[in-house]
Amino acid sequence: MWNYEKRLQYPINIKNCNPTLAAMIISQYGGPDGELGASMRYLSQRYSMPYREVAGLLTDIGTEELGHLEMVSTMVHQLTRNLTMEQIKGTPFEAYYVDHTVGVWPQAAGGVPFCAIEFQSKGDAITDIAEDMAAEQKARSTYDNLLRLCRDDPDVYEPVSYTHLT
């Protein structure tokens, strides 16, 4: 069903560790408007879509969201992979580190774990499409917020911007 290419949709090469940015960007991995929920939303809704063309489109979009999930997790990993304890202490990443060290785990920036209640699949085409449109706007707002936070680091800004626009 899928053809996985062993490369990211957009190259990511973050040179500088930044635990604070990692703690914010993780929200697009497992936060309320993140890519994990987005992929699950589309891939779940496709089964009850009465129009095969739209079901196929939901599959395509859900698959693309999985690609975004991979990009976000790569950003978090690259921002944290060489952290020292001195860099971690006193940052928002410190509490995350206690439970996950530098593993990538789905949660919001505020520490709330991912929960399937964050997305919906009602089995009604109009309701589900309305859910999708609202979810895309919430994700856009979150990416806008992240772009304001990472403006000073082009290695982070560029892949966040790419993911925001696709």
Tell me what each language-model feature is:
Residues 152-159:
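Short conserved catalytic/interaction loops centered on acidic-Pro-aromatic/His motifs
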Residues 2-3:
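Long, low-complexity intrinsically disordered regions enriched in Ser/Thr, Asp/Glu, Pro/Gly
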Residues 60-106:
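Conserved alpha-helical segments that form or flank metal/cofactor-binding pockets of metalloenzymes
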Residues 7:
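Conserved oxyanion/phosphate-binding beta-strand-loop segments in alpha/beta enzyme cores
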Residues 17-51, 67-71, 126-150:
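Alpha-helical bundle segments that constitute or directly flank the non-heme di-iron/ferroxidase center
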Residues 53-56:
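A cross-kingdom feature marking solvent-exposed beta-strand/loop segments within repeated
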Residues 13-30, 93-132:
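Acidic/His metal-coordination segments adjacent to aromatic residues that form catalytic metal sites
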Residues 163-166:
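Conserved small/polar residues in nucleotide/adenosyl-binding loops
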